[in-house]
């Protein structure tokens, strides 16, 4: 019996896939649990329509994320910190500091999306990668200056 999956099932496939299963498995488990629909002509057409609508939404969101990434690429953050000897900072500039500086500029970014291997502990210019979306990354310039 052919069914359309409405949930991701590791043993069968992804949402929206049409798979062939035993009729008893479909009637006794998949249909009552709401994990699948029977693959009738009407359901297949509805699935195709949903896929097209979802693809259009994804493309729109992708374009918006590309626009945000472009704006972030143009940002240069200037952070002032107290300095000890030889241009070393008393503390450090962490992902949280970069996140709050970006928020002041109007960009809402999760701290985990800021790709900073180690905190910045010296004066200078640095580039930091910021993940805007799963496949889209931007780079932000970070300048650490001496606070007077």
Swiss-Prot record:
Pfam families according to UniProt: Ribosomal_L9_C (PF03948), Ribosomal_L9_N (PF01281)
GO cellular component, one term: ribonucleoprotein complex
Disulphide bridges, residue numbers: none
Keyword Nucleotide-binding: no
Keyword entries, A-Z: Ribonucleoprotein, Ribosomal protein, RNA-binding, rRNA-binding
GO molecular function, one term: structural constituent of ribosome
GO biological process, one term: translation
PANTHER family in alphabetical order: 50S RIBOSOMAL PROTEIN L9
Role description: Binds to the 23S rRNA.
Family, as annotated: Belongs to the bacterial ribosomal protein bL9 family.
Descriptive protein name: Large ribosomal subunit protein bL9
Originating organism: Syntrophobacter fumaroxidans (strain DSM 10017 / MPOB)
């Amino acid at each position: 019996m052919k069914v359309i999956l409405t949930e991701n099932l590791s043993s069968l496939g992804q949402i929206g896939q049409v798979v062939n299963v035993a009729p008893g498995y479909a009637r006794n488990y998949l249909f009552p649990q709401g994990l699948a629909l029977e693959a009738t002509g009407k359901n297949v057409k509805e699935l195709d329509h949903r896929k097209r609508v979802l693809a259009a939404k994804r493309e729109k969101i992708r374009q918006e994320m590309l626009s945000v990434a472009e704006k972030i690429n143009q940002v240069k953050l200037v952070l002032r910190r107290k300095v000890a000897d030889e241009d070393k900072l008393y503390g450090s500039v962490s992902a949280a500091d970069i996140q709050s500086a970006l928020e002041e500029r109007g960009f809402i970014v999760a701290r985990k999306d800021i790709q900073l291997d180690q905190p910045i502990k010296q004066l200078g210019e640095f580039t930091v990668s910021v993940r805007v979306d799963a496949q889209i990354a931007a780079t932000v310039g970070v300048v650490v200056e001496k606070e007077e």
